[in-house]
Amino acid sequence: MTKKVYVKTFGCQMNEYDSDKMVDVLNAAEGLEKTDSPEDADIILFNTCSVREKAQEKVFSDLGRVRELKEAKPDLLIGVGGCVASQEGASIVSRAPYVDLVFGPQTLHRLPQMIDARRTSGRAQVDITFPEIEKFDHLPPARVEGPTAFVSIMEGCSKYCSYCVVPYTRGDEVSRPLDDVLTEVAGLADQGVREVTLLGQNVNAYRGALTAGSSEVADFATLIEYVADIPGIERIRYTTSHPKEFTQRLIDTYAKVPKLVNHLHLPVQHGSDRILMAMKRGYTVLEYKSVIRKLRAIRPDLSLSTDLIVGFPGETEEDFDKMMALVHDMRYDTSFSFIYSPRPGTPAANLHDDTPRDVKLKRLQLVQATIEENVARISQSMVGKVERILVEGPSRKDPNELAGRTENNRVVNFPAPLAAHPRLIGQMIDVKINHAYPHSLRGELVLVSDDASAATH
């Protein structure tokens, strides 16, 4: 009987990418297949996030729930990976002795060896070292499950923002060689991938050697241009970028590379220069707005999303008003906004925080309500227009329908004959939007490519 692995992912797209690689590694080494049911699994892995306290505590809550599975099935292996693993290390085993494996983001490729060592020695295995880019040299080719894919181009972060734990859990920035990234993207394109999302903690800080060991370096703009030249790739996204690394060369790329989507996630974190300085972000509000102004001069309809932290230590009403002014000015189309969560070991954790919790909550609600209004307004403005979408697969709401995404990252559901589904998935098609919902759009098929058109008849 085929053995199975269950992976639960917390946090960012980097973790989603890493989770897929965990499955690929275990499939290549031991023939394990992915399951969506922890009860059916022979190995259960939690790929964790430590950016916020709530996510970290959720891991231990979930570990407590799978403990019963381990008691019923003693051969079941339980592993904790990701940033909580890097931060907590062996203390995870002390707190939850039934955990067999603890591994960091940079050592997931060592899972087969760790599993062998656990079975041989009977002792929990912990490996949270930072072997830089080694993991990419040991990962098997990706197994594609649709027309979109993530591609990690770098690891770590060297910005050391005062509130952020990522540099301590993922290490400093290390870029993959250019040819290594292009080989992976080309392999994905050969398997039918049409859209790639380039991933990094600060993806636009990419500085990759042209080849392994080469002294010549390619910047992020160069990488995008090369990816755009790969046959089959029709759309390029990236996340997460940093305002400090948004060079003029990268801005110019929006004019030169049509395949670069009309959507950008650029975290600002706050709208007050005083708070940005305390956060050690390395830019001012004016500098951030200057980047957006230049981009919108090239792409007037550029859709912009961001990250916002409310209630950072010392935040005054005046600081918050400046954040709200920025939210209105930038016309954000989605944000990931949260109340500040102090992370142990970061400089900001030692700052005096005298803002009441209920004040922070009210501020967060105001930010989120304002951005939701923006989202609704932008979605409504798309009604009646024809949008180009990449068909990703059956709709989650109705498997008899199909779903895809617009350039500005809106999900569009639309009816299509069942017989046409296999041929339409992976196609770029035109859909007329006829209804806007809070978190998706609905439309009808207008125009498809010749191959897809034949499939609808």
Swiss-Prot record:
Protein name: tRNA-2-methylthio-N(6)-dimethylallyladenosine synthase
Parts forming coiled coils: none
Binding site for [4Fe-4S] cluster 2: 157, 161, 164
Start and end residues of each TRAM domain: 380-447
PROSITE patterns given in the database record: MTTASE_N, MTTASE_RADICAL, RADICAL_SAM, TRAM
Free-text comment on the cofactor: Binds 2 [4Fe-4S] clusters. One cluster is coordinated with 3 cysteines and an exchangeable S-adenosyl-L-methionine.
Residues covered by the MTTase N-terminal domain: 3-120
Keywords: 4Fe-4S, Cytoplasm, Iron, Iron-sulfur, Metal-binding, S-adenosyl-L-methionine, Transferase, tRNA processing
NCBIfam families (alphabetical): miaB-methiolase, MiaB/RimO family radical SAM methylthiotransferase
SUPFAM superfamilies attached to this UniProt entry: Radical SAM enzymes
Span of domain Radical SAM core: 143-377
Organism taxonomic ancestry: Bacteria, Pseudomonadati, Pseudomonadota, Betaproteobacteria, Burkholderiales
